[in-house]
Every structure is written in C-alpha cells, then in structure tokens.
C-alpha cells in the first residue's frame, strides 16, 4: 500500500496545512473584456472575413501591418526568388546558345564564364545587386540576354523600393512615438470649482513636443434601446475642459484633463457604488498630434474601467519651480490624495445644494480646529536688565 507522502507532493500538503479551513473560498471574479487596453491596443478579434482578397489590393499597407518575423521572411524570400528566377533565365540562355558545353571554337558566348547553374545564380546576384566582380558579363551575341538584363534591373529596383520602403515605414511608425506619451493608471472623480469632475493626467516624456495635440474621450458601454435592440459597444463623446478651451492642449508638461459632470454628461447618474458593480463602463482616452521631429501624426490611447476610477481623490502636484525653471517629478505622476467629496451622483448634487454647502462648511472647519490648538509660549533666550539701560 502506498503511503500518503508518496502520492501527494510535500509542497501541496504544506500549503493546505497553512490554509484556514473556516475561511470561505472565493473564485476570482472574471473581469470585463476591455475594448482598448491600457497600452492602447484595440482588443478586437476579426473573424470569418470572407473577402481576403481586399488585403492584396493594398499590398504595401498589408506588408507594413505584418509582424516583424513575417516582414523579414517576405523581404528575404522576395530577393531569393528573384535571384533564382533570373538565374534560371540566364542558364536557359546559355544552354540554348550552347555555352555550357566545352568547345574549342572561337564562338562568342551570350554571357561569359557561365558553365553551370551555380555560375548563372552568381551572375544573377551580380546583375541585380550591381556587385560587379568583373568575371562575368553580357556580350553582344544574344539580344535576348540584353533584354533579360534590362528586365532584371527594373525588377530589382522595384523590389528594393517596395521592401526597403516597407522596412522604413515599420521602423518609423507613429505608434513608436506614442510609447513616451503616458497616462495615469487611475482616473479620479472629485470636486473642482464646486462641480464633480472626472480627471486624468497625461504627460510626455520626450523633450520634442507634440504639435497641435488634441485629446478626446468616449464612454463605451452596453445599452439597450427602447425597441429592445442591444448595442454592445455604444460610444458617447465626453466634452472636456483643459483650462484653455476646446480639445487642444499644450503638452510641454504633464496636464490634468478634466470633464465637468453636468446634465449633458454620460456620467451624470454615476454613483460611487457603481464603480464597484458597474461592469459595462469603459472610458476611452485618445491623444492625437503631430510629431515635431518627423511630422508624422501619432496617436496614443488608453482606457479606464469602472474599478480604475477613484472617487474622492485628487492628483498630487508634480511640477515645481527650481533654479529659474520648472521641474517635473514623474515618480509622483499617478499619486493621488483623498479629498472631501460628496458620495452622491452629480444629479443629486445639482438637485440638493445643501450637500455641497455642508461639505464646504466641514472643510472650512478643519483648518480652524487646527488653529485653536493652544501653543506653548516660547521663553526668551536672553533678558535685558534695567541696569543695562541706565
């Protein structure tokens, strides 16, 4: 009979002994699928596409969109296939002219020094890449050889233009610049100017600026129309305020972008309790602008789910003036602090102003209580005697 130690691993036994048998077990709640990931990738899988030929109508964009291993494979195979194809053409020309058979005559060959397929392949590489070793060359004996030489040069230039252009576009893609455009991990909802506001922080790590930068926000949620139609991804635009009006921003330093939750806001009926149970809420943030150094339009994206929105908190300041210039402490980029915030929806706050007045009064009493603390009288370190004044 086998012992228990031989059947169950020791690590498993120690783990089970450390567990509390009275503590109930909970399975991790499955998180809602994001429409846009935190890194900006769209979480959409395209299936059952019937018209695959549409991708071949725009070959260049298809090549640029491919992954790097596939692009490098196509890059290598395009050159190898063209070299082999024209090597076969040069070998057939030499075979038809009788240049492959050894002869003692003085007949001039179509291409000198071609005696096998290997030499024809080397000559094909020399022609297309213009290496020019000088051991093989086309003569005036065969007009067809001259025509093949012209065609191979044209085809080689086309392959170079397409493939090298594809490699350049992949290395200079706009989303590379978006890697240094950062968003705060969490968004916050707090009072600003007496109104509930949805706020997030955005920054740029590079010194080169984003010209004509604009920012947009959308709420994506699952809705049902009065007719019973279920819309799984209903998108609603969110108006924003950034202190300068409009959606344009001057991103020379990290900015706090905020949206006033008013009657026109899709977040007007959002309560603090909904942030823990509202699984269909996702706020997408899109930052778009022109890269100053390259002139390419770039776009950075992120999203916030309901559990990534902090109620009653505010971002800490990270910009300070030092030695006549402004410095940014990115170690506190996503840090927040708790602030007094009503635990109600923006609609309830607009309908009952006493909630805001009570909160304002409570906030005003806080500093007064600190001031009423009795302070010990400081004893003087020296005294002046009357004799010294005489």
From Swiss-Prot:
Annotated residues for binding of K(+) 2: 133
Main location, first listed in the record: membrane
Matching InterPro entries: Ig_E-set, IRK_C, K_chnl_inward-rec_Kir, K_chnl_inward-rec_Kir6.2, K_chnl_inward-rec_Kir_cyto, Kir_TM
Effect seen on changing residue 167 to L: In PNDM2; has severely impaired sensitivity to ATP and markedly increases open channel probability
Transmembrane segments: 66-92, 143-171
Residues reported in the UniProt entry to bind a 1,2-diacyl-sn-glycero-3-phospho-(1D-myo-inositol-4,5-bisphosphate): 176
GO cellular component: cytoplasm; inward rectifying potassium channel; plasma membrane; T-tubule
Record annotation: effect of changing residue 53 to S: In TNDM3; reduction in the sensitivity to ATP when compared with wild-type
Consequence recorded when altering residue 182 to V: In TNDM3; reduction in the sensitivity to ATP when compared with wild-type
Gene3D superfamilies noted in UniProt: 1.10.287.70, G protein-activated inward rectifier potassium channel 1 (2.60.40.1400)
Subcellular location per the Swiss-Prot or TrEMBL entry: Membrane
Gene Ontology MF terms: ankyrin binding; ATP binding; ATP-activated inward rectifier potassium channel activity; ATPase-coupled monoatomic cation transmembrane transporter activity; potassium ion binding; transmembrane transporter binding; voltage-gated monoatomic ion channel activity involved in regulation of presynaptic membrane potential; voltage-gated potassium channel activity
Disulfide bond sites: 110-142
Post-translational modification: Phosphorylation by MAPK1 results in changes in channel gating that destabilize the closed states and reduce the ATP sensitivity.
Resulting phenotype, residue 64 to M: Displays gain of function; increased open state stability, reduced ATP sensitivity and increased channel activity; almost completely abolishes high affinity sensitivity to glibenclamide, an inhibitor of ATP-sensitive potassium channels
Origin superkingdom: Eukaryota
Protein residues bound to K(+) 1: 130
Record annotation: effect of changing residue 296 to L: In PNDM2; with neurologic features
Alphabetically ordered keywords of this record: ATP-binding, Diabetes mellitus, Disease variant, Disulfide bond, Ion channel, Ion transport, Membrane, Metal-binding, Nucleotide-binding, Phosphoprotein, Potassium, Potassium transport, Transmembrane, Transmembrane helix, Transport, Voltage-gated channel
Record membrane topology: Multi-pass membrane protein
UniProt topological domain (Extracellular) ranges: 93-116, 134-142
Domain notes: There are two PtdIns(4,5)P2 binding sites: A canonical site where the phosphate groups of one PtdIns(4,5)P2 molecule are coordinated at least by residues Lys-67, Trp-68 and Arg-176; a non-canonical site where the second PtdIns(4,5)P2 molecule is coordinated by both KCNJ11 and ABCC8/SUR1 residues.
Family affiliation: Belongs to the inward rectifier-type potassium channel (TC 1.A.2.1) family. KCNJ11 subfamily.
UniProt subunit comment: Homotetramer; the homotetramer binds four ATP molecules (one ATP per subunit). Forms an heterooctamer with ABCC8/SUR1; one KCNJ11 homotetramer interacts with four ABCC8/SUR1 molecules. Interacts with ABCC9/SUR2.
Related illness: Hyperinsulinemic hypoglycemia, familial, 2: A form of hyperinsulinemic hypoglycemia, a clinically and genetically heterogeneous disorder characterized by inappropriate insulin secretion from the pancreatic beta-cells in the presence of low blood glucose levels. HHF2 is a common cause of persistent hypoglycemia in infancy. Unless early and aggressive intervention is undertaken, brain damage from recurrent episodes of hypoglycemia may occur. HHF2 inheritance can be autosomal dominant or autosomal recessive.
Stated name of the protein: ATP-sensitive inward rectifier potassium channel 11
Source species of the chain: Homo sapiens
């Amino acid at each position: 009979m086998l012992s228990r130690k031989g059947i169950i691993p020791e690590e498993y036994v120690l783990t089970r002994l450390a567990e509390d048998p009275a503590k109930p077990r909970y399975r991790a709640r499955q998180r809602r699928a994001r429409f846009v990931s935190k890194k900006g990738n769209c979480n959409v899988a395209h299936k059952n596409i019937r018209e695959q030929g549409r991708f071949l109508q725009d070959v260049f964009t298809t090549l640029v969109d491919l992954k790097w291993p596939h692009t490098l494979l196509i890059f290598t195979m395009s050159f190898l296939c063209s070299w082999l194809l024209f090597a076969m053409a040069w070998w057939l020309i030499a075979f038809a002219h009788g240049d492959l058979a050894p002869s003692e005559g003085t007949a001039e060959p179509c291409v000198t020094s071609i005696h096998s397929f290997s030499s024809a392949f080397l000559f094909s590489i020399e022609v297309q890449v213009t290496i020019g070793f000088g051991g093989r060359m086309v003569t005036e004996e065969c007009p067809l050889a001259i025509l093949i030489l012209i065609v191979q040069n044209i085809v080689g230039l086309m392959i170079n233009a397409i493939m090298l252009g594809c490699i350049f576009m992949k290395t200079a893609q706009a989303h590379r610049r978006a890697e240094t455009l950062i968003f705060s991990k969490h968004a916050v909802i707090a009072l600003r100017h007496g109104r509930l506001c949805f706020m997030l922080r955005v920054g740029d790590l590079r010194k080169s600026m984003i010209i004509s930068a604009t920012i947009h926000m959308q709420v994506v949620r699952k809705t049902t129309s009065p007719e019973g139609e279920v819309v799984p991804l209903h998108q609603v635009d969110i108006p924003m305020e950034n202190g300068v009006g409009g959606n344009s921003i001057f991103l020379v330093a990290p900015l706090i972008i905020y949206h006033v939750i008013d009657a026109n806001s899709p977040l007007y009926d959002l309560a603090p309790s909904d942030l823990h149970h509202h699984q269909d809420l996702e706020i997408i943030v899109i930052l778009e602008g022109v890269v100053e150094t390259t002139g390419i339009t770039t776009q950075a994206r992120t999203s916030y789910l309901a559990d990534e929105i902090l109620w009653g908190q505010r971002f800490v300041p990270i910009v300070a003036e030092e030695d006549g210039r402004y410095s940014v402490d990115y170690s506190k980029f996503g840090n927040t602090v708790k602030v007094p915030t009503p635990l109600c929806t923006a609609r309830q706050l607009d309908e009952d102003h006493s909630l805001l007045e009570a909160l304002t009064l409570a906030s005003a009493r806080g500093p007064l209580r600190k001031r009423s603390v009795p302070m010990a009288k400081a004893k003087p370190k020296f005294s002046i005697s009357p004799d010294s004044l005489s």
